[in-house]
Amino acid sequence: MHVIVPYTDVSPKTRLNSILTASERTAFAQAMLYDVISTLQSNGHTVELLIPTETVMQATDQRDQETIIDSTGVSTEAVSTSTSTHADTTEHNAASDNYVSQSPTHTLSVTPEAIMRILRDDDDPDNEASTQERDGDKEYIDITVDTAQNQIQSNQIVVTADDRALTPAVNSCLNRLSDTETPFSELAVVMADLALITPTAIERLFAREGDIVLAPGRGGGTNAIVVRHPAFRVDYHGTSYRDHYQAATDASLSVGVVDSMRLGTDIDKPTDLPEVLLHNNGMSSVWLQSAGIELNLDDNTGRVGITRKRKNEDVD
């Protein structure tokens, strides 16, 4: 399965700002993205990162004219839209063995090293400030990096730069299903904050029959979707699960639904963090623990929450 994973590093996870700083939210979002990518790749699926252009530019250390390369001399394989206004192609960069989605006016050469920089912002000045707040202990931010490099095949990740909102950006990718020159008969979209994802859960989704297969989120959103019909388009505004289900049935498309705790739990707010510590065996839980975030039982309610212990705090 070819899986599109939308991701942005522009002010991610703002609802966690009561427990994490801005740079910490970025680092935690990257840790969750690691878990999603490594899980998908462990089952042999291909991953396409759908990210803002500026993220790619920063990762490749390219600016202005350096990012604009005449594509007429590039041998490309068309893989996305058939329309002229949002047509994309995929270039095989022989030097890096990496595939890059590009617009018809420019190509961004993304090496495996740049992929890892996208997943870990080495140049974020906030990291230094946040580190100083924690008495110089930088380990909590970088704890996942070495493991990630071992688990993620960065040279097998496709990168598509798109600055539009989530819905039009994803629909541009889905246009490939109606392009007879592309090899796609089905595409999946999986959100980058599904920290509880496992190979078993994702295979349940991909094995489910239906023109459209939905994995609803707890708040009414669509956390993952498989599209096997070229006419279907997503709309992530509001209660998108209900809207996607209705749109599919209105078009006489068969719909499969996967009721999964692991796919249904997107991590957005502090009350979601206990789920990561309880059920994630990857980098997301390691990152939280390294940041001093622990499970905490509320004696009054009997429910499990979280507490944060700073590195310089005395242990009771």
UniProtKB/Swiss-Prot annotation:
<dbReference type="GO" id="GO:0043814">
    <property type="term" value="F:phospholactate guanylyltransferase activity"/>
</dbReference>
<dbReference type="GO" id="GO:0052645">
    <property type="term" value="P:F420-0 metabolic process"/>
</dbReference>
<dbReference type="InterPro" id="IPR002835">
    <property type="entry name" value="CofC"/>
</dbReference>
<keyword id="KW-0548">Nucleotidyltransferase</keyword>
<feature type="region of interest" description="Disordered">
    <location>
        <begin position="72"/>
        <end position="107"/>
    </location>
</feature>
<keyword id="KW-0547">Nucleotide-binding</keyword>
<keyword id="KW-0342">GTP-binding</keyword>
<feature type="compositionally biased region" description="Polar residues">
    <location>
        <begin position="92"/>
        <end position="107"/>
    </location>
</feature>
<protein>
    <recommendedName>
        <fullName>2-phospho-L-lactate guanylyltransferase</fullName>
        <ecNumber>2.7.7.68</ecNumber>
    </recommendedName>
</protein>
<comment type="pathway">
    <text>Cofactor biosynthesis; coenzyme F420 biosynthesis.</text>
</comment>
<dbReference type="InterPro" id="IPR029044">
    <property type="entry name" value="Nucleotide-diphossugar_trans"/>
</dbReference>
<dbReference type="GO" id="GO:0005525">
    <property type="term" value="F:GTP binding"/>
</dbReference>
<comment type="similarity">
    <text>Belongs to the CofC family.</text>
</comment>
<feature type="compositionally biased region" description="Low complexity">
    <location>
        <begin position="72"/>
        <end position="85"/>
    </location>
</feature>
<feature type="region of interest" description="Disordered">
    <location>
        <begin position="119"/>
        <end position="138"/>
    </location>
</feature>
<dbReference type="Pfam" id="PF01983">
    <property type="entry name" value="CofC"/>
</dbReference>
<comment type="function">
    <text>Guanylyltransferase that catalyzes the activation of (2S)-2-phospholactate (2-PL) as (2S)-lactyl-2-diphospho-5'-guanosine, via the condensation of 2-PL with GTP. It is involved in the biosynthesis of coenzyme F420, a hydride carrier cofactor.</text>
</comment>
<keyword id="KW-0808">Transferase</keyword>
<comment type="subunit">
    <text>Homodimer.</text>
</comment>
